[in-house]
């Protein structure tokens, strides 16, 4: 696969993160898309270099991505229980 494909997918996920800011779930899905594209890019680049120091990097990235997915699920469930929705507009800090 071409690394340009994963860079384009990262940019698409980044633009989704910038434009779709209404629901918390859509933001978390865009973050997961970004993490997946970075993981694929790291896996391909470590297979090209064939260096022993770059082999565990995709696994470390995958571990951080799983932790991020778990934390985002906890945040989504907590927000849904407290605010009864996942809209970003209900997270304003300036409510008086």
UniProtKB/Swiss-Prot annotation:
It catalyses: a ubiquinone + NADH + 5 H(+)(in) = a ubiquinol + NAD(+) + 4 H(+)(out). The keyword Electron transport applies. One of its GO terms (molecular function) is NADH dehydrogenase (ubiquinone) activity. The chain crosses the membrane at residues 1-21, 24-44, 57-77. It is an enzyme of class 7 (translocase). It comes from the Eukaryota. It is a multi-pass membrane protein. Keywords: Electron transport, Membrane, Mitochondrion, NAD, Respiratory chain, Translocase, Transmembrane, Transmembrane helix, Transport, Ubiquinone. The keyword Membrane applies. Its EC number is 7.1.1.2. It is found in: Mitochondrion membrane. Pfam families: Oxidored_q2. GO terms for cellular component: mitochondrial membrane; respiratory chain complex I. Belongs to the complex I subunit 4L family. Core subunit of the mitochondrial membrane respiratory chain NADH dehydrogenase (Complex I) which catalyzes electron transfer from NADH through the respiratory chain, using ubiquinone as an electron acceptor. Part of the enzyme membrane arm which is embedded in the lipid bilayer and involved in proton translocation. This is NADH-ubiquinone oxidoreductase chain 4L. It comes from Myxine glutinosa (Atlantic hagfish). The lineage of its organism: Eukaryota, Metazoa, Chordata, Craniata, Vertebrata.
């Amino acid at each position: 696969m071409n690394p340009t494909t994963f860079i384009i997918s990262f940019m698409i996920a980044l633009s989704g993160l910038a434009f779709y800011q209404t629901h918390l779930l859509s933001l978390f899905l865009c973050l997961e898309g970004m993490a997946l594209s970075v993981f694929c890019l790291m896996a391909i680049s470590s297979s090209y270099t064939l260096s022993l120091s770059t082999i565990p990097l995709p696994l470390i990235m995958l571990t951080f991505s799983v932790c991020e997915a778990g934390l985002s699920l906890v945040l989504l469930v907590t927000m849904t229980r407290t605010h009864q929705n996942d809209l970003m507009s209900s997270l304003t800090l300036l409510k008086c």
